[in-house]
């Protein structure tokens, strides 16, 4: 089983306000990925989905979509706290995988996400989405790497774990899928 954790707990420091609620194409930013993932999970029997956040409106939005909502009160301290809150909510088994998807990548497609989920197989320790030599989120980790994920601190993500030689690169269809919205300017550019 692959457990998808949709990470929506960031502080939006560079954005100046909660970017997850900021409208993009008629929907709050976080809903783009959430809606795509919720629809994808409905077509597969090999994965679950949970949204992890400290924001009530975002948690309520997940519940309204029928998605499990995990409260992460310490997310303001950094991404590692959101990751741990999500992991704590799982009944992780030795053969399981965990996929981490960040909520500020509105152009990630179901096709690319399905390729990442398909990478969850014996012999694979981790996987990441890449385009043109640039790699980023989303990422996938085998349950065997959970101790390393729990050891993360502050705003550290799993980048160090992804340097392993048994880490698979999953192709995205375009560079736009890896675009994350961190500032109002990046949001305006994305909307163009």
How would you label these PLM feature ranges?
Residues 2-103, 107-135, 143, 166-174:
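Nucleotide and nucleotide-moiety/phosphate-recognizing core
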Residues 19, 149-152:
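Short, solvent-exposed loop/turn segments at secondary-structure boundaries
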Residues 23-24, 140-142, 181-182, 190:
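Short beta-strand-to-turn element immediately C-terminal to the catalytic PLP-Schiff-base lysine
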Residues 82, 112, 145, 154-158, ...:
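Internal, well-ordered alpha-helical segments in soluble enzyme and binding-protein domains
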Residues 105, 137-140, 150, 178-179:
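A residue-level structural signature of the nucleotidyltransferase/glycosyltransferase Rossmann-like core
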Residues 136-147, 184:
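Conserved nucleotide-sugar donor-binding
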Residues 151-192:
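Conserved alpha/beta core of the MobA/IspD/sugar-nucleotide pyrophosphorylase nucleotidyltransferase superfamily
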């Amino acid at each position: 089983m692959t457990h998808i954790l949709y990470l929506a707990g960031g502080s939006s420091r560079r954005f100046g306000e909660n970017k997850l609620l900021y409208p993009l194409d008629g929907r709050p930013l976080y809903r783009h990925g959430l809606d795509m993932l919720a629809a994808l999970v409905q077509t597969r029997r090999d994965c679950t989905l949970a949204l992890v956040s400290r924001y009530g409106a975002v948690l309520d939005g997940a519940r309204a979509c029928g998605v499990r909502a995990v409260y992460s009160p310490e997310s303001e301290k950094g991404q590692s706290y959101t990751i741990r809150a999500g992991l704590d909510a799982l009944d992780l088994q030795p053969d399981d995988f965990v996929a981490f998807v960040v909520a500020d990548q509105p152009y990630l497609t179901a096709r690319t996400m399905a390729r990442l989920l398909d990478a969850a197989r014996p012999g694979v320790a981790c996987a990441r989405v890449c385009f043109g030599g640039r790699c980023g989120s989303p990422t996938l980790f085998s349950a065997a790497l959970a101790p390393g994920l729990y050891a993360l601190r502050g705003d550290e993500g799993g980048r160090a774990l992804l340097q392993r030689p048994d880490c698979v690169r999953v192709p995205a269809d375009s560079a736009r899928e890896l675009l994350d919205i961190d500032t109002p300017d990046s949001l305006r550019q994305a909307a163009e």
